[in-house]
């Protein structure tokens, strides 16, 4: 609910940006996109920056969505907001997130030599006033976010208990891969995840682990296949739980 409120404030233009921090696979992107869709937004490559991104791509996305009421989604933003983010990207984001700007907007600049052109070869000004809202999603914890960015935006740490995660997944389950996975497979996956948790098995509960379960169940057509499926699921959950190097 807190996340929905932060996103709502950006949608309404009350706050220029929110940075949502949390472990991968907990439904951050899915729920943000659902809320944006409900508010009438269509998120496409034109207003979404995903994963690694050059300063030029970031600037052009902001330039093309500079109006009041526009929303830019920066998804999987680790390479743009973390300790190893390029200085040019940090500077562009700092300007775009400046909450002290006047009614004219936030002055965003891209200091590059020579002429700046968009993907169609059309010249683009190297500075512009921007009034869009920004939603930034990262797997980094709040403390790992660049301090200057952290001070310019609301930040939320999405740290859920296993019980919370199961409730979140159950709530969004009907909409997860609805074109590929049957509700029957998803219900079996949900029940089996809950069973593994109750038994104290090593498991990393996330939307991704749920999808893994459901995909395996989707191909289990008889009792023998079902037993094999559950063995495969247990193995995948065990492998997922022992992965190291998590940022969050």
Region locations from a protein language model:
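N-terminal pre-Walker A segment at the start of P-loop NTPase domains
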Residues: 1-13
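Loop/turn-to-beta-strand initiation segments
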Residues: 68-72, 127-135
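A short helix-turn-beta junction within AAA+ P-loop NTPase domains corresponding to the substrate/partner-engaging
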Residues: 144-164
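Conserved AAA+ ATPase small/helical "lid" subdomain
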Residues: 175-242
């Amino acid at each position: 609910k807190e996340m929905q409120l932060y996103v709502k404030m950006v949608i309404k233009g009350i706050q220029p940006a929110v940075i949502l921090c949390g472990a991968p696979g907990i439904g951050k992107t899915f729920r943000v996109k659902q809320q944006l869709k409900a508010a009438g937004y269509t998120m496409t490559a034109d207003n979404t920056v995903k994963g690694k991104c050059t300063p030029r791509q970031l600037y052009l996305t902001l330039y093309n969505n500079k109006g009041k009421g526009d929303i830019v989604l920066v998804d999987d933003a680790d390479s743009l907001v973390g300790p190893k983010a390029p200085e040019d990207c940090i500077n562009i984001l700092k300007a775009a997130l400046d909450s002290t700007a006047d009614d004219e907007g936030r002055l965003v600049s891209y200091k590059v030599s020579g002429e700046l052109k968009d993907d169609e070869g059309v010249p683009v000004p190297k500075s512009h006033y921007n009034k869009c809202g920004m939603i930034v999603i990262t797997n980094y914890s709040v403390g790992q976010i660049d301090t200057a960015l952290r001070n310019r935006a609301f930040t939320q740490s999405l740290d859920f208990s296993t019980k919370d995660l199961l409730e979140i997944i159950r709530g969004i389950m009907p909409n997860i891969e609805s074109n590929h996975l049957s509700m029957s497979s998803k219900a079996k996956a949900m029940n089996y995840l809950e069973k593994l948790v109750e038994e104290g098995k090593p498991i990393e509960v996330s939307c991704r682990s749920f999808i893994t379960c459901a995909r395996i169940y989707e191909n289990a057509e008889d009792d023998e296949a079902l037993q094999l499926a559950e063995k495969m699921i247990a193995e995948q959950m065990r492998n997922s739980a022992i992965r190291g190097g998590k940022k969050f």
